[in-house]
Each structure stands twice: as C-alpha cells, then as structure tokens.
Amino acid sequence: QLLRNLYELQISRSGQNLTILGATSGDTGAAAISGLLGKSGVTVFILYPNGKVSPLQERQMTCTGASNVFPLAIEGTFDDAQRTVKELFSDLSFREEVGLSAVNSINLARILAQSVYYLFAWLRLGPAERECTTFVVPTGNFGNVFAGWLLSRMGITIKGFRVATNQNDVLHRLFHSGEYSLDNVVPSLAPSMDIQVASNFERLLFFILDGDTRRVREVMNSFLEEGRYCFENFAVEGFSSSSVTDREIPEIIHSVNREFGYLVDP
C-alpha cells in the first residue's frame, strides 16, 4: 500500500518510530491494519464504534494477532471516534513526542491515492464517454468522492459526482437545501456510512471559499457549536446527491442481482 511505503520512507529518513492513529466506521480500519500489521517501527491504534461495524469488519481488525496493532472499540459513534482522533492531532507537542500520523482520510496522501482510481476508470472509457461520465459514490465521510472531485480540478473532464448516502443523509440535505446540520446517527444496513459529520467537507469548503482559511474556521466552528450552518445559494458545480432508506437497500440489491447477476455491497 502507498501509505505503508511512505511511512517506511519517513522512518528511514527521520529515525523516529511512528504511532499511526485512525478512526473507522468499518472499511478503513481493516484495510489499514492489513497493510501495517507486523511492520517494524510502526504502532497502529484504530478507534471504532462498538457494535456499529459489521461482524466481519470487526474480526478483520481484532483477530490479526499482530503485536503492533491495537483496535479500540469506543462507546458512541464514528463521529465520536473521529473527534477524539482530531483532538489528539491538535495537541502539537504530543503529536511530535509520539510521532503521530494518520491513516484515514485525515491524511491527504490517502485522498490523493484514491484520486488515481477515478483516473484509471476514466482512461478505460472511450473519448466520447469520458466527457459525459458521472461517478456515483457511496459517501459518509466525503473522502472518496472528494478525491474524484480533486482529479477534476487537476484538468480531467468529468461531468459530475453523485453523492449517495444512506438514511444518515447530512450531505444529501446539504446539497439539496444548503443546510449543514447535525442529527443523531441512525444504525443502518450500510454501517460504513453511518456518519453525520463528514470531515472532508471542510476541504471542499476551502475551495468554495476561495482558500480563505479564516472563513473556513469560522464556518466549521459555528457548525460544531450550533449544530447547523446555513449557506446562502449553496451550489457546487458537478455535484448532485441522493439518499436511500433501509427498506430500499435490500430491494435494490435484489433487483440488481436479478437483472445483472451481480451482488451489490450495501
């Protein structure tokens, strides 16, 4: 994995061991642990919400037997785990002392690596198809779809990105009404998307506000303090959204499997 190789390079250059910290709603934690288990000079701590990831994902994180891996189940939601991780990263002296580094989308290297997936898919299309392609992306933390949007900012012509959410639809509500508002996390059949604070939206906001970091901080602080923020005339070219309920998810899985013989991951 790219991050593993980058960490090895960093350790060889600095001579300092790394403490890798991440929060996961299911997918990232298992992938990070798989890539870093048994690595010399690296200790991995992954926080995840107790009882809110799938049994398979939890086993993938907790049954490795690796001495450098510490999966930590916390009470609460993914948003609580993510907030804890961000608080630790904001302590600069602690971060330097333990060689703290991130493994989920807090780390921009993860986002940049994901943008390559979109380029690979785009290159496999014919010239006529490329300019009319819309990527539909299951979205919770807004990392993967933001990676695709970044690629379009680099000059690759992509028609659009459709943000697909489950019933935890903070992003769908944002794109439709301009209101970014907190709500309770509702457990769903798509637990990796059971998120109400989409951390990578802050990165999109940086572009929307023309790189005005002071204004970005004001908006995000207001959102976190008040639980909501209303944007006037909110629109980002190329983005659309939709959400589905727990009733619709199995219906769609069954329909796709019946018509195409493909079993969709919820």
For the regions a language model picked out, list residue spans one by one:
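PLP-dependent amino-acid enzyme catalytic core
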Residues: 1-266
